[in-house]
Amino acid sequence: MKKKYRIKKNEEFQEVFRRGVSTANRQFVVYTLDRPEQPYFRIGLSVSKKLGKAVVRNQIKRYVRQCFLELKEEVVPGKDYVIIARQPVAEMGYAEVKKSLLHVLRKAGGLKKRGRTTDLA
């Protein structure tokens, strides 16, 4: 992902933790913070050393980044997302990670509504 789509600084992470809203499932915790002045979304990833060695942690981060790359058009812009991976993610494959991330993002309101338009007229 391009640098402008990343959250890297500790102060930015802390702001999302303090002012953001958290949503979780068994595999991920997602903090979201509205940034209306920002025309794009940004993501920050947190994978604890408890999940495994560096190889496993980096693989999890690659999976999550790839999910966001594929869902780029569906993710609501103008928000910061901090994704924290939990223990079960270490044993999951890419398809399972994507399904779980979709679930928690939908729950957090981080995905655009699908093409369900209802005409009231």
From Swiss-Prot:
Coiled coil: none annotated. The keyword Nuclease applies. Keywords: Endonuclease, Hydrolase, Nuclease, RNA-binding, tRNA processing. It is an enzyme of class 3 (hydrolase). Signal peptide: none annotated. Pfam families: Ribonuclease_P. The keyword Hydrolase applies. It catalyses: Endonucleolytic cleavage of RNA, removing 5'-extranucleotides from tRNA precursor. GO terms for cellular component: ribonuclease P complex. RNaseP catalyzes the removal of the 5'-leader sequence from pre-tRNA to produce the mature 5'-terminus. It can also cleave other RNA substrates such as 4.5S RNA. The protein component plays an auxiliary but essential role in vivo by binding to the 5'-leader sequence and broadening the substrate specificity of the ribozyme. Consists of a catalytic RNA component (M1 or rnpB) and a protein subunit. Belongs to the RnpA family. This is Ribonuclease P protein component.
